[in-house]
A protein has these predicted regions:
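Catalytic cores of the polymerase beta-like nucleotidyltransferase superfamily
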Residues: 1-262
């Protein structure tokens, strides 16, 4: 991030931290923001886990900080607050956790997305790293499943087989995440994807479409489609493609019908 972006981020998170503290709430930065931050990638999407009613807290945050409240998932209590700070736009996604943050992380999908840090800790660390010596601190990363190690080894690893039972769109997300980051899906996770590949047919089409479009927008799209086929996902989604496997074409064509279709 550039200095203006870091300054805007610190200001936004400071305001949020002060608001949560007034209500005696704990807040943690979790998931994709931590992953991307450790990779040195800038992002303006920040997932915040709070120990209270996330919808109520998000409503208060939008009101106090002059942001826009967006209800994302009423059933699961997830809301977004869009905030403009110093010409930078931030998307704060709020969810609730009960008990300890480790239990919340255990319900996530992949190890590299199952890391967190306390909000105040992150602010202190970023201030120190950005030339504010009055707030020297060391970031305390909450990483019960070895996500940082997998991040360093460039691996996408499922927390358990239950993640695919809970939401089969994660089958596609594993491949898309690996493709975006230029990571590898680790062998046991590949085995689980093959095992659960047919369950992708139970997912609403719009969710499948979103993941596929994101995957196809990346470089080497044909390679990613072949990988989906190796994992049993491609034919689960488009079974008609299977009819072209091994069907030869006139000599002017090098590939069979299936490969030509890809």
């Amino acid at each position: 991030m550039s200095f203006p972006e870091i300054s805007s981020l610190i200001t936004t998170l400071n305001k949020l931290h002060e608001l949560l503290s007034r209500g005696s709430h704990r807040g943690y930065i979790v998931g994709g923001f931590i992953r991307d931050w450790l990779l040195g990638k800038g992002t303006n999407d920040i997932d915040i886990a709070v120990d209270g009613n996330a919808l109520s807290i998000a409503t208060d945050v939008a009101k106090e900080l002059g942001g826009k409240f967006v209800l994302l998932d009423e059933a699961n209590g997830i809301a977004r607050v869009v905030i403009m700070e110093k010409e930078q736009q931030w998307y704060l996604d709020f969810s609730s956790f009960s008990g300890d943050i480790e239990s919340d992380l255990a319900r996530r999908d992949f190890t590299i997305d199952a890391m967190a840090t306390e909000l105040g800790q992150f602010i202190g660390y970023e201030c120190a790293a950005s030339g504010f010596p009055e707030k020297q601190s060391q970031l305390k990363l909450i990483d019960p499943f070895g996500g940082k190690n997998d991040l360093e080894n460039r691996i996408v690893r499922a927390l358990s087989d239950q993640i695919f039972e809970a939401d089969a769109v994660r089958l596609l997300r594993a491949v898309r995440l690996a493709a975006e980051l230029d990571f590898a899906v680790e062998p046991e996770t590949e085995r689980l994807i093959r095992c659960y590949s047919q369950t992708i047919t139970k997912i609403p089409g719009e969710r499948v479409r979103e993941e596929l479009l994101r995957l196809l927008s990346l470089p080497r799209a044909c390679y990613h489609l072949r990988y989906l086929d190796q994992l049993g996902l491609l034919l689960a989604l488009i079974p008609e493609l299977g009819e072209g496997k091994g069907v030869e074409q006139p000599t002017v064509h090098f590939w069979d019908v299936f490969d030509h279709s890809l």
